[in-house]
Amino acid sequence: MKYEKIEQEIKNLEEQKDKLKKALNNLSIKTKISNSILGIDLNVLNVFKCFKCNGNLILEDGIINKNQIVEGKLICNCGEEYAIISGVLTAGNSCKAYEKTSLEDSISDYIHETDTAFLENVQRGGEWAKKKLMQLDLNEKILLDLGSGIGFFLRNIYEELPGNCLYIAVDRDLNKLLFLKDVIERRNPKRNILFICADFLNIPLQNYSADIVIDQSGTSNYSFEHKNFLLHELNPLFKPECYMLSSYILFKNFSIHSHISIRLRENFTSSKVKGEIQKLQFQTIDERTSNYLERGGKYENFFVQGEEIYTYSFFGRRWG
């Protein structure tokens, strides 16, 4: 009996070892390090314009590797300059080369410290958004991601993107973009991803660029500091006929101790958000409302005890 028990344990260990080897093999396929460094492809220079004067931008002092600009600057006749740092285009003064922090550790800490219900809500919302995006023909389309962060959304859909679309990831945190770029550089197959570090109102893109607008809480994050509804400010960047896939942080109620000042609260209400989407002439294809949440993680310090939040997700289209 003892011998049979030991044999069974050996068999179990071998099965676990096989599973582990298979998992590691899958991981190595997905994260196989490529020699190519992602930069700004020479073929996409025509999508840029100066955010100050709308002038065309010219490449100066460029270091180019396999058709990708990895260092250098784009300059405008008005004197505005856009530095390219490690393949990321920067605009305005908000993008400083912050001292690199270990975002991998931060993500791990965040997952362990965040309320399970909140994480499940993030995951469900992400899967819903992915399903909606996959319903569209993305061939030769430009996708504009407003507030890409560390790329939870992009990494979830990366393999599904066709090789001939352009995905533009915009964030004002250079560290997060460099981290995301490093992750993407390890992925196969290769996709056309453009990284821009800029405040939302300083995005140096031509008008009518975006075929598909991805706004996974970018507007909500902007609303913590600004009364204007972000998508109205950026509407000139969207094509008259385009799709939008968005998610908004909404409050069920506000506490007297709320961190959201009274003048900014309207942008966190369902009626306001839905009304603004209507004003932009987007028609609903599908929508989703999450459960109410009482707790978040260490980065969700925008709501206090007694307040409940939820997310409203929207998928829609407008016809020019």
Give the location of each predicted region.
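Class I SAM-dependent methyltransferase Rossmann-like catalytic core
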Residues: 98-126
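Conserved alpha-helix/loop element of class I SAM-dependent methyltransferases that forms part
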Residues: 120-140, 156
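Class I SAM-dependent methyltransferase SAM/SAH-binding core
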Residues: 144, 150-202
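A short acidic, Gly/Pro-enriched loop at the edge of an enzyme's catalytic core
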Residues: 201-213
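A short SAM/SAH-binding and catalytic strip from SAM-dependent methyltransferases
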Residues: 211-226
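A short glycine-rich, Lys/Arg-flanked "PGG" loop and its adjoining helix->strand segment in the class I
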Residues: 228-243
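Conserved class I S-adenosyl-L-methionine
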Residues: 243-268
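Short alpha-helix
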Residues: 265-281, 286-287
